Amino acid sequence: DRDAKLAQADGKIPIEEFEYKVRRLINDYIRPPKNEYKLDRALWWMDRFKKELRTDVRIANKHDLFKAYEVENIIHCAAMSALASKERKESRWGLWHMRSDYPMKDDEHWMKHIVLKQGDSFDDIRISYAPIIKM
C-alpha cells in the first residue's frame, strides 16, 4: 500500500536529500553522451533508489508523502528513459540521443519507435517497436 509510507517517520534520509541524490544521479548517468556502462549504472541506481524509498527515506507528514510520490515517479521515468536509450543502438536526434558507443545513425535497423509499456507491476516494463509513419 502506497500510503504505508507514512509509517516511515523514523527513516534516516530526509526526502529532500533523497530527491537531490536521485536527480543528481539521473543527470550523471542518463544525460548525453550516453553509453552502455552509464545506462547500466543508471538502471542499477534506479533499482536501488526504489528500495531505499521504501525503507530508508523519512516521511514524517503529508507534504513528505506527496514529495515521495513525486520522487517515485521521477525514478520510474528515469528507469524507462535509460531502458529505451539502452535499447537504441545508434545515435539520433542530435545531442538528445548521442551514444558514444554507437556514434552513427543507423536508419536500416533503427528507423522505428521504441515503445515502453508498464506491465502488471511497477518493475515490469515491456519493450516493443512501432514503425514510423511518414505523412
Task: Put a short name on every predicted segment.
Residues D1-M135:
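Glycine- and aromatic-enriched mobile tails/lids
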